[in-house]
């Protein structure tokens, strides 16, 4: 039985651990629970089909990620994980400019040709749109995508790790440094113990370079600070409201029990130690959210989460074996799409590590692209 160590238990590491453990491999996950982990802060929107990004390699990952959720949730439920944080509630992409919605609708139909999981595509009037999300401002028409979903990153990650543990995986809280000799990574050293492994997989997000640097590897991962606000409405049944995708770079989505989430900021100049909830960040999120959904004004602001989204060069994720080092794999750079791509990419990474055929050609995502 082969043994694998995963360093970093965000959505990507948790998914990789689960899919490796399902094969009977011996899996150890090590994570120091760093404040600011992207998955822990994230509220995910699974609706990549309307994206205007032109990078086809990025889109193939996002499309595969959205498609994979149905199978993944079924697998997790069979493993006794009922609180996955995932719910297919649909999404409304809203706008006041009908011509913009025309183009969006056209894009959705084109994308549905090879992504039937998009579901129904429906053009909604302003009144129909507001009926689905009652706190919206008047005047927003929309394109409704029935196959879109929301994800609570914290809950999904917990489910994946719990299911992995049921399959024999061990999850350890602590620091991990790589053990390296004669060009081969042989395991890791934690605060208290050494662990040997056939391969080590680094899925440490914004902190990956810190782990790889002692090997003489400069891993080019940058990060963006995000502040995400949570609200509570006491008089609304929000559990089935769709995700709202406004014309701006923000989003609004709802969860059960009156919880509304709005965000997020995109801060490029913050350091990894800057976990502050700032006045400017709050102002940005609130002003953009209230412009779109003035009905949010009476909601209680209950929490602001801070996370650091990791990006690799060209804003394209990397996944695979680290060049010129035996026994070392890395995956990173999912940015703001972590909850769309992460579970699928973890499944693909597990196949790659095991020497099995992956669903996608992973060559465009070679980690060599992130090495200086």
Swiss-Prot record:
Entry GO MF terms: oxidoreductase activity
Cellular component GO terms, alphabetically? cytoplasm
In the Enzyme Commission scheme, what number(s) does this protein have? 1.-.-.-
**Enzyme class, UniProt record, top EC level:** oxidoreductase
For this UniProt record, the keywords arranged alphabetically read as follows: FAD, Flavoprotein, Oxidoreductase
Annotated InterPro entries: FAD-dep_OxRdtase, FAD/NAD-bd_sf
Positions with a binding annotation for FAD: 4-18
Q: Which cofactor does it need?
A: FAD
Organism domain of life: Bacteria
User: Which residues does UniProt call coiled coil?
Assistant: none
Identify one Pfam family in the record: DAO
Q: According to its UniProt record, which protein family does this protein belong to? A: Belongs to the DadA oxidoreductase family.
Task: Name the chain's protein.
Answer: Uncharacterized oxidoreductase YurR
Species of origin reads Bacillus subtilis (strain 168)
């Amino acid at each position: 039985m082969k043994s694998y160590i995963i360093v970093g238990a965000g959505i990507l590491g948790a998914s990789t651990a689960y899919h490796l453990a399902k094969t009977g491999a011996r899996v150890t996950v090590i994570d120091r629970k760093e404040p600011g982990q992207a998955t822990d802060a994230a509220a995910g929107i699974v609706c990549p089909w309307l994206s205007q990004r032109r990078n086809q390699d990025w889109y193939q990952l996002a499309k595969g990620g959205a498609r994979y959720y149905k199978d993944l949730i079924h697998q997790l439920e069979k493993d006794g994980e009922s609180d996955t944080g995932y719910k297919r509630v649909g999404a409304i992409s809203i706008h006041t400019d009908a011509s913009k919605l025309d183009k969006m609708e056209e894009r959705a139909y084109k994308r549905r040709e090879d992504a039937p999981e998009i579901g129904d595509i429906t053009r909604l009037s302003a009144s129909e749109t507001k009926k689905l999300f009652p706190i919206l401002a008047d005047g927003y028409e929309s394109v409704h995508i029935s196959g879109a979903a929301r994800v609570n990153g914290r809950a999904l990650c917990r489910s994946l790790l719990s299911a992995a543990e049921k399959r024999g995986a061990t999850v350890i809280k602590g620091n991990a440094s790589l053990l390296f000799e004669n060009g081969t990574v042989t395991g890791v050293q934690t605060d208290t113990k050494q662990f040997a492994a056939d391969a080590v997989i680094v899925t440490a997000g914004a902190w990956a370079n810190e782990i790889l640097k002692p090997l003489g590897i400069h891993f080019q991962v940058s990060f963006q600070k995000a502040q995400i606000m949570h609200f509570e409405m006491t008089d609304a049944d929000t559990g089935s409201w769709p995700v709202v995708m406004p014309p701006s770079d923000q989003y609004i989505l709802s969860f059960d029990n009156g919880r509304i989430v709005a965000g997020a900021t995109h801060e490029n100049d913050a350091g990894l130690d800057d976990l502050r909830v700032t006045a400017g960040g709050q102002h940005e999120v609130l002003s953009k959210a209230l412009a779109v959904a003035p009905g949010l004004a009476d909601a209680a602001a209950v929490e602001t989460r801070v996370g650091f989204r990791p990006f690799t060069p060209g804003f394209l994720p990397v996944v695979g074996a680290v060049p010129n080092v035996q026994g070392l794999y890395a995956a990173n750079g999912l940015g703001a799409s972590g909850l769309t791509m992460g579970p699928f990419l973890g499944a693909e990474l597990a196949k790659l590590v095991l020497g099995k055929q992956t669903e996608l050609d992973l060559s465009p995502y070679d980690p060599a692209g992130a090495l200086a």
